Every structure is written in C-alpha cells, then in structure tokens.
A protein has these predicted regions:
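Internal "kinase-insert"/substrate-recognition segments embedded within catalytic cores
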Residues: 214-224, 236-240, 260-263, 275, ...
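N-terminal Sec-pathway targeting helices
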Residues: 6-19
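N-terminal module-boundary/linker segments of secreted carbohydrate-active enzymes
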Residues: 140-180
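Conserved oxyanion/phosphate-binding beta-strand-loop segments in alpha/beta enzyme cores
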Residues: 181-238
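Short, well-structured beta-strand/strand-turn elements
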Residues: 258-271, 405
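Extracellular/lumenal mature domains of secreted and surface-exposed proteins
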Residues: 34-142
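Middle-to-C-terminal accessory/interaction subdomains
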Residues: 148, 156, 167, 171, ...
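Low-complexity, Pro/Thr/Ser/Gly/Ala-rich linker/spacer regions in secreted
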Residues: 38-51, 136-149, 552-570
Length: 570
C-alpha cells in the first residue's frame, strides 16, 4: 500500500514538543507498506488543505522499464496546484518539474531494484504535500524462461506439427473430446519428439468450421521431464471470430503496460505435416502463441523463495454456477460446481494436498462479513488480497471492453495465493473477446454495469471494491493513464498498422489461412483490414467518452449495485 505523507506546520520543536509527538503518532497510523502500490483508504482529515497522490504505470516489470507517472486527484482546498515536482530516480532530489504537464511525466529504469518515487505538489499559498509510490524493476535473467526468445513478437515464425495419418484421424473422430495423440513438433527450427497434441477451447472449439482449431502441446506427456526452453505446455489460439486477429495479442500487451501480471503472446504460422501420406505440409493459418498460467508463470512473477502457492483456475457454466467469489460457508463442497464434480476454483498446483482454505477465507472477507463502513471492508480486504493489481485489471477490461470474465461471466481468470505476501493475486486469462466482442460499446460506463451477462449472477468483489472512495480514485487514475498513454486514437492506429503489416502476409501464405480462404472460411482478407479499422474507431470513441467522464469529476460516483445473491442448483 502506498504511504501518504502530509504537510507539517513548521512549529519550533522546543515550543510544542508534546504536540509534535502526538502528530507523529497520528501520521504513523496512516502509514502502510509502500510496496503494495495502492492508496490508503482513510478519509482525508478535515484540516488538510492540500493532498498529493502519486501513480505509476506500470509499477513493476522487467528492465529496461518505462514507467508513466501521474498526480491524478492531487488537490488543494485553497486553490489550484501551481507546481508538480518528482524525484524519479529516488536520489532524494525533486529534479523533474512536471508542472507544464500537470504532473504527468515518464522515466526509463534500466537497473533492477525497488525505487521509492516521490511526488511533491505546491499550491498558490505555498502549502506543500508529498506522496510516494514504489516501482519494482526485475532483472530478465531472474526468469526461469527466456520469454524474449520464445515469445519474440517482432517476427512471425513457423511451427510445424508432424503426425501420422492414424493419429490425425483420431483427433477428428471427436474433436470436443480433446484426445491427446503423439506427434513431433518443430518450433522455430528446433524439433521436439513425441509430444502430446490435443484440441483446446470450449465455444470456439465447437464453432470453428474447419481444421483451424486451437491446439495444446504437452511436451512431457509421453517423455517425462521433456520441455521446450523450460516450458512444459505450449498453447496456440486460433483467434476464433476475430477478423482482425489482434484482440487477444493487444489485450495482453495492454495488461502488461498497466502492470498486471499477464502472459506473453506472439504470432506464429501453424503447419501440419502428415508424415506418411507423401503430401507436402498443409498450412492451417496464423495463430497467437500464448503463455500458459502455471507454476512457472507465477514463480517468475512472484518469486519462488517461499515455494509455489496454490493456483486456482476459475470456471463457470449456466445454471450450475460460477467462480463468483461469494461466501457459501467453510466447506468447499458447498461452493459452485459448474461441471459437476469439479469446484469452480480448479486447483492447478500442490495437487497432492488440496487446500481451499485461502479461497474460502477470501470469499468470507469479500462476502461473509457485514462491515461498518467501506473503509473497514478495505482494511480487511487488503490483509488477504492484492487490491492494486485487481484495480489495474479492472481498469484494462472496462476500458477495452472485455466482458467475458469477472464480474460478468465468472470465468477466464486465475487466483494465486502468493506465499511471499500472504495475499491472493488476481490473474487474467483468455482475452480474445476484448474490444467489445462480448458486449459493450464506446459509452459503457466507467465503473461498468450491474453484473451479469452469463452464468455469474452475483459479484460481491466487484460491488464492494467500488464502494471504497479511495479505490474509485485509484482505479480512475489507472484508466486516465491508459487513455493518455496507450488506449487512444494515435497510439492504437500505430499499433494496428504495425501488427497488420507484420501478420497480413500470413493470411495468403501457401494455400491461405483457413479462417479466410477455402471451405469453412469465416472471413475474407478484406475483413481483416476492415476490422482493424473498426478497432481504431472503437478505441477513439471509447477514449473520448472516458476522458470526458474523468475530466468532469464523475469518476467520484459509485457503481450500480449488483444483482441479488443466487440460489445454487444442485
């Protein structure tokens, strides 16, 4: 949590020593651990004349790391702020004057480490306030996976699956069964033998009308401990129903920009070689290769010194329930089971000793207690949950209109019990429905709408978090930074043009991408270009709407209440 510091009155110590002691005690009560990166939730004392708020985006990442800063919400009761100064390199000096930019500035951190960055604001009466935010820069070599080689997104590389006719036919007997069969795979010129290949997906698997399904490769299914550059599973998504092919990739990039722990993604061309049919390799089309959320993912983001904590994958189905983060008691057996035997929070790690106490405790804090005030709820929540990470996630999904997740459908996310902090982390997943593909338009409200669009009928975390005034401000500050530096017409135009230039040739490679050419094609190559232009238009309109809301001060309003609590169907 970010520490808020307040201006002193300049009294001489020898005159009011007892008063100073009292004031220091009060101020100390407001200080919290700065490494968490969120604001305190206590209401601003009535005798404060000036308040500073410092925000960073991202607040953590791999070096070299460019961070954008804002003083969103900083204000004086005696007039406007006339000076914004930053200590951006943590050297103790305010050597960056951002007054001309109303407090906005940027800085690149090349050296790994934790930096305490301080903002100082001054009003026309000479009153001063400061605020600090921590930026954590990680060394790429500390990762167990060379992400920058495996997920090199500066080029489109070739992946070729080499499989027998019998095994290929076995997949197509029932694609929905996701049967694993043996094959070899060439990844960017490097071959792995005897991997397991299977289809993946749910709705997209059923609806894709040709062989361009999404694929999952398990490297160690037939050969124990076999890995590809320290990865055991490789995922290739077909970008079903996205004519632009860009939604998922750009959504992951946007999350990374916001400082949300999200997977890497890169474009590849996927080929199939039936090794015993005397025919050349067949081109399926362009895919997005996406990093899997697993023990290595969380270890590389949150560390391994204290072991790997419990990782849960959220699930949802109509009628039978969803991962709603509601409290159903102390027995995990009482919680929703969307697919019958499996609980909505599917344990992915530490399977030898299944333990759901962390999830139950989080649900209890979120939904099982009546609090005296939003501030009391916030104090309890921050003991068990990384609120700042969740607010950054919400800022991204409500800005780019990805409604196929919490707080609407109740799936497409993970929860991780971080053993280092003792808090639960919220991790996004499956982002192909971003940019309004699952609903929402340019004027979708800043704080969203009452849930729900699918299986989820009750989203207490969504409702309660936005009842806290400080959280609404922090969230709005993150939306502001996104709109200013990433989600706007100039930046998105450059991104769409760059990606389309890179991947456009892959649509007509060989016999053509099966999503665009041949039997079962869902789009035309012209729609690829048109949908990219539509993404630009939606982004521009959405950014204009959000900017108007932020500038008007309407961000201080509360969100609509969620629907009533559901009754589980056995």
């Amino acid at each position: 949590m970010r520490a808020r510091s307040h201006p002193g009155e300049g009294f001489r110590i020898f005159e009011i020593a007892l008063v100073i002691v009292f004031l220091l005690a009060v101020i100390a009560a407001l200080f919290v651990n700065p490494s968490q990166g969120i604001g305190v939730v206590e209401a601003r004392p009535s005798n404060e004349t000036i308040q500073a708020y410092a925000y960073a985006m991202p607040a953590a990442g791999w070096s070299p790391l460019t961070v954008h800063f804002s003083a969103f919400g900083s204000a004086s009761r005696l007039g406007r702020i006339i000076r914004y100064e930053w200590d951006l390199d943590a050297n103790g000096r305010y050597d960056t004057d951002a007054t001309d930019q109303a407090g906005y500035t940027s800085y690149m951190y090349k050296k790994p480490g934790d930096y305490t960055i301080t903002l100082k604001v001054t009003d026309g009466q000479g009153n001063v306030a400061t605020d600090a935010v921590t930026v954590r820069v990680r060394y790429p070599g500390s990762s167990s996976v060379d992400y920058w080689t495996v997920f090199d997104d500066s080029q489109v590389r070739r992946v070729e699956l080499r499989i027998t006719q019998a095994n290929w036919a076995a997949i197509w007997q029932n694609p929905s069964a996701k049967k694993r069969v043996e094959a070899d795979i060439s990844l960017f010129g490097e071959t792995l033998e005897s991997v397991a290949v299977s289809t993946k997906g749910n709705a997209s698997l059923e609806a894709t009308p040709n062989e361009k399904k999404s694929w999952k490769i398990d490297t160690n299914y037939f050969i124990p401990d076999q890995e590809y550059r320290n990865l055991k599973q490789l995922l290739f998504h077909n970008n079903f129903a996205d004519a632009s092919l860009l939604r998922e990739k750009m959504a992951y990039d946007m999350l990374a920009f916001a400082g949300v722990p999200a997977g890497h993604a890169a474009f590849v061309e996927f080929w199939i070689d039936i090794v015993d049919d005397d025919q050349p390799s067949e081109y399926l089309g362009l895919y997005t290769m996406v990093e899997r959320v697993d023990s290595k993912f969380v270890g590389n983001r949150f560390g391994r010194a204290d072991g790997i904590g419990n990782l849960y994958k959220a699930d949802a189905q109509p009628v039978t329930g969803a991962a709603d983060l509601a409290y159903y008691g102390e027995n995990i057996g009482s919680y929703p089971r969307p697919r019958g035997a499996d609980v909505a929070y599917g344990l992915q790690t530490n399977l030898e000793q299944p333990d759901y106490r962390g999830i139950i405790n989080l649900c209890h804090v979120v939904d099982g207690v009546e609090y005296d005030s939003p501030q009391a709820f916030a104090a309890a929540l921050e003991q068990v949950f990384n609120v700042d990470g969740y607010l950054r996630y919400l800022a991204v999904i409500f800005t780019n209109l990805n409604l196929d997740t919490y707080p609407y459908t109740g799936n497409n996310f993970y929860l991780y019990e971080n053993p280092t902090t003792g808090k639960v982390e919220f991790l996004p997943w499956d982002l192909n429905n971003s940019w309004g593909h699952f609903g929402g338009d340019a004027t979708f409200p800043l704080y969203g709408q009452p849930c729900c669009l699918g299986p989820l009928q009750w989203a207490p975390l969504f409702t309660r978090v936005f009842e806290v005034p400080q959280y609404r401000q922090d969230y709005s500050a993150y939306v502001d930074l996104l709109v200013r530096y990433w989600f706007n017409r100039p930046d998105i135009t450059q991104r769409v043009a760059g990606w389309q230039s890179l991947i456009g040739p892959s649509l007509t490679r060989s016999t053509g991408d099966k999503m665009y050419v041949g039997p079962g094609a869902m789009f035309t190559p012209q729609q690829f270009t048109q949908d990219g232009l539509a993404l630009i238009s939606l982004t521009a309109d959405r950014a204009d709407y959000l900017r108007a809301v932020l500038d008007s001060g309407a961000w201080q309003s509360e969100i609509p209440k969620a629907n009533t609590r559901p009754v589980l169907i056995p």
